[in-house]
Design a protein with these regions (language model features):
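Generic hydrophobic alpha-helical membrane-segment signal
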Residues: 22-25, 42, 71-74
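Non-catalytic surface loops within mature trypsin-like serine protease
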Residues: 10-12, 58, 91-94
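Short, well-ordered beta-strand segments in beta-rich or mixed alpha/beta enzyme
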Residues: 2-9, 39-66
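Glycine-rich beta-strand-turn "strand-cap" elements at beta-sheet edges
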Residues: 2, 40-48, 76-102
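An amphipathic, aromatic/His-enriched active-site/gating alpha helix that lines ligand/cofactor pockets
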Residues: 28-37, 55-88
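Short, structured helix-loop boundary elements
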Residues: 15, 19, 49, 68-71, ...
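Short acidic, gly/pro-rich beta-turn/loop elements at beta-sheet edges
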Residues: 16-18, 48-50, 62, 97-99
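N-terminal first-folded block
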Residues: 2-31, 35
Length: 102
């Protein structure tokens, strides 16, 4: 499984516009093949900081998403409405039940 975290600091005047855009985009992205989660969170201490969390089944489905029109729209919205976006990716492996008890 691949997890992508995108942290953005939204321009204060664009915060409501960003929330509307990301709500619509997140629900569309969630319908893409291989997407296990697409959600966003607002920082408790900074109302203009948001984190978008995506979980993908594998690298192949993530790569397909990164080539999609939806991703291009997402990047465009982030570039117009935010400053200095930060994208982190981590690969994860689901542990067997026995391994989690150790």
């Amino acid at each position: 499984m691949i997890i992508r975290l995108t942290r953005v600091d939204i321009l204060p005047a664009k915060r409501q516009e960003f929330i509307q855009a990301i709500k619509a985009l997140a629900s569309e992205i969630l319908n893409e093949m291989g997407c296990r989660e697409c959600s966003f969170f607002q920082d408790k201490e900074d109302e203009n900081r948001f984190t978008l969390k995506e979980k993908w089944a594998n690298q192949q489905t993530l790569d397909k998403h990164l080539q999609s029109d939806k991703y291009a729209v997402l990047v465009g919205a982030i570039n117009v409405l935010s400053k200095n976006p930060e994208i982190n990716k981590c690969s994860t492996q689901v542990l067997e039940e026995d391994e989690t008890e150790r």
